[in-house]
Each structure stands twice: as structure tokens, then as C-alpha cells.
Regions:
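Surface-exposed loop and turn segments in beta-propeller and other repeat-based domains
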Residues: 28-61, 93-112, 186-214
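WD40 beta-propeller blade core
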Residues: 21, 84-86, 96, 139, ...
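Short loop/turn segments that connect beta-strands within beta-propeller blades
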Residues: 24-26, 89-93, 142-146, 180-184, ...
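Conserved beta-propeller blade signature
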Residues: 8-11, 73-77, 127-130, 166-169, ...
């Protein structure tokens, strides 16, 4: 994010690191933060590092992604941990949170692995959009965390990016989806989802000889650049980055 003419990196780390940090563009640490114990719900000692164990669960802190609030603060998705969205001020001080683990009824405002998050400014007012991955949907919230709407029918949406009136959604099961400002699907890029769904043992992810140029295997993230090109990062055996060049 550019702040006062200077670029900064915001990074998350889960597993044994269980923290998030703000870095300069050259990699120097501005600050590093740990589990927001004031939010409640976390196991005792979850904010204490280093650690050698690696327990998982809804009482753990395993952050996955950021979204930047228009006021200079940010939202943080605890995507592998408590399944909540935390809000912080510009200095990394915890303010509030919303969301909870969902049950089989998949009620609005509850999550099952909220891996990705971004600010959707395609409408009249900016909204928080959450990639509710294991529930196969996107959910929209006000900047205060009030549930607004959702879109079902995705596979395993991992994150979201926005450019002009388009939303970009990497779907882990072999495709990247584009939505318009009305949240309607306008296209699936590199769609190989049928082959990925049939690969129950995930052999394709491990065997590069089975990858097909122009088709995606396991897109874990995607973003637009300043010219509207798309970059897709895939979680495969040795990793793969694909650039899709904007044509019009």
C-alpha cells in the first residue's frame, strides 16, 4: 500500500509464526503484531512466540489476508484460525471483529475458512468482500461489519481483487472467475475445473507433465496490475505464476 508517497508491504504468516507485519519496500520491519487477545476466543498463550508446536483450531490465530480500509486502517482475515475478520487502525491497534465459524446451514455472516478479503468499491459505497472458501461463496459486509449479501455457486474462492467494475476471484479448483459490478459472472479464465474435480488424489498438482498451458490447476491468488493484466499464483508442486495480458 502507498502511504504518503511511500510503498509498504503488509504480510501474514500462519503455522508457527502466527503473526502479521508491516514492512518497507526494502524489507525492513515497521511493526509486527500477534494474536489480538483482547478480541476474546483465543487459547491462552496464542500471542506468545516463538513456538515449536503447531496446533490448529478455531481458538488459534492463523491470519491469511489483508484489505485496506479507506480511513487508513485495515481488515485482517483470520482465515485458518478463528474464522473471524479483525479490524485495526493505521498503527496496527485492534479495534473490533466480526464473523464466526459457520454450521451446515451456512448462515450469512458466518464463515468456513475465510481465506481472502478485499474492499469492493464497484458500487455506490465501499464494502468488505470476503472469500468464504470452504462454503464456496463470497460475502459482502459494510465497513462496520454488517452482513449485506452473498454470492453462491463458486468452487473454492481463495481471494478477491478489484479493478474498475470487475472483481477477480481465483477459484482453487482450476479456474479464475470474473464478476461485474452487479456480481454476475462474466467469464471463467483457464477453466479446467472438471479435470481438477475428478483428480481426487491431487496427482495433477504434483506432476508438471499433466499441466496444460492456458489451463489452471490450483490458483491460490490472483491480482490485477496497473494496466489491467492479471497475475495468477498457483499452489502446485514447485509453484507457478501466470500472466494474462489484457487485450482490450
Amino acid at each position: 500500500r502507498n502511504e504518503g508517497g511511500e510503498d509498504f508491504l503488509y504480510v501474514t504468516a500462519y503455522q508457527r509464526q502466527r503473526s502479521f507485519a508491516k514492512l518497507t519496500a526494502t524489507g525492513e520491519t515497521v511493526w509486527r503484531k500477534y494474536a489480538p487477545m483482547e478480541a476474546g476466543g483465543y487459547a491462552d498463550g496464542e500471542d506468545v512466540l516463538p513456538r515449536q508446536d503447531n496446533p490448529w483450531g478455531r481458538d488459534r490465530f492463523m491470519p491469511t489476508n489483508f484489505a485496506f480500509h479507506p480511513d487508513g486502517g485495515f481488515f485482517l482475515a483470520d482465515g485458518y484460525g478463528s474464522y473471524r475478520i479483525h479490524r485495526y487502525d493505521a498503527d496496527g491497534n485492534w479495534l473490533s471483529c466480526f464473523g464466526s465459524p459457520s454450521g451446515p446451514e451456512k448462515s450469512g455472516g458466518a464463515f468456513n475458512l475465510p481465506h481472502g478479503i478485499w474492499i469492493d468499491d464497484t458500487g455506490d459505497a465501499p464494502k468488505v468482500v470476503v472469500a468464504d472458501r470452504a462454503n464456496g461463496r463470497l460475502q459482502w459486509f459494510s465497513l462496520d461489519g454488517e452482513y449485506l449479501s452473498e454470492l453462491d455457486g463458486l468452487l473454492l474462492p481463495a481471494n478477491v481483487d478489484v479493478r474498475d467494475d470487475l472483481l477477480l476471484v481465483p477459484d482453487l479448483v482450476g479456474r479464475v472467475t470474473l464478476l461485474n459490478a452487479a456480481h454476475e459472472v462474466v467469464g471463467h479464465l483457464g477453466d479446467d475445473s472438471a479435470r481438477m474435480n475428478a483428480d481426487g488424489k491431487k496427482a495433477i498438482r504434483r506432476d508438471e507433465s499433466l499441466w496444460i498451458n492456458g489451463k489452471f490447476v490450483h490458483p491460490h491468488d490472483a491480482c490485477f496490475d496497473g494496466e489491467g493484466n492479471i497475475y495468477v499464483a498457483e499452489w502446485v508442486q514447485r509453484g507457478r505464476i501466470t500472466k494474462l495480458r489484457r487485450l482490450t
